[in-house]
Amino acid sequence: AKTVLVYGHYDVMPVDPLDEWTTEPFEPVVRDGRIWGRGADDDKGQSFMHIKAFEAMCATGQLPCNVKFMLEGEEEIGSQSLYKFCREQKRLLKSDVILVSDTSMISMDTPSITCGLRGLTYMQVEVTGPEKDLHSGLFGGAVANPANVLARLVASLVDDEGRVTIPGFYDDVRELSAAERRALNKAPFRLADYKRSLHIGDVAGEAGYTTMERTGVRPSLDVNGIWGGYIEEGTKTIIPARASAKISMRLVPNQDFRKIAKLFERYFRAIAPRSVKVDVRFLHGGAPYV
């Protein structure tokens, strides 16, 4: 009999900001027919679904194959131990099919088979100016403000057409054929429902591509977090000494996450003004797969 290996993960993204939760994140509740709690969607819920499906097929004598489960606890931080584990446990993990229990559906009523996932390059940048915070009344307009500089640098990474501006970023991207694009856009995706579910007025992204193409087969760049200066209640008129951001780039076949990290660092340093110092760090990455 064939063997299926089911991969999933039980670790989750951080729960902050806590004040936006209506229930405790790690105390799941059923509301409106749905389970609410951290990991209900990514990825405890999906893994549980496959485990229960396996259990039901065993109970009814309908299991047509062997099944193995591999659930890890480091997916959200780049699966740092997974590569070593897979190399050391090749015999244990040997299978004919790998089922990734960590994907999505086009809609609530449309079963979907995901046959590819974009890759990732995840970076952190820090822009530093003066050695300490300065008073904006005394130094504003004369000293580079790291927060202002960072905002300009980050904004320049994607142009008005939604394209990443890093030189060489698209060099290895495999372009889809007209037939592949037609096949992709035959999927029962409803843009109006998509916008409604996200509570947005309109979509955005790379010009010339549909939302399905933008999220599935085109690379992208996003700021995941940005911080610096005074953000508490009240006022504090400073020029912050430093400002930082976390930036992720989603990659498509033929793009190498290590190469993209080097291109990003080289470009970010090149566009930074001499009035500030820049630190660029690669956090983690993963290869795209189709």
Model region roles, listed by residue range:
Residues 112-128:
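Flexible glycine/proline-rich, aromatic-decorated loop/lid segments
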Residues 1-38, 57-63, 247:
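Acidic/His- and Gly-rich active-site-bordering loop/insert found
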Residues 41-116:
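Acidic/histidine-rich catalytic neighborhood of metal-dependent amide-processing enzymes
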Residues 250-251, 279-290:
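A short beta-alpha structural unit
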Residues 106, 115, 122, 136-226, ...:
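Acidic-enriched catalytic cores of C-N bond-cleaving enzymes acting on peptides and small amides
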Residues 142-143, 233-241:
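Short, solvent-exposed beta-strand/turn "edge" segments of beta-rich domains on protein surfaces
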Residues 111-115, 232-237:
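Short beta-strand/turn micro-motifs at beta-sheet edges
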Residues 36-37, 131-137, 232-233:
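Short small-residue beta-strand/loop micro-motif enriched in glycine and branched aliphatics
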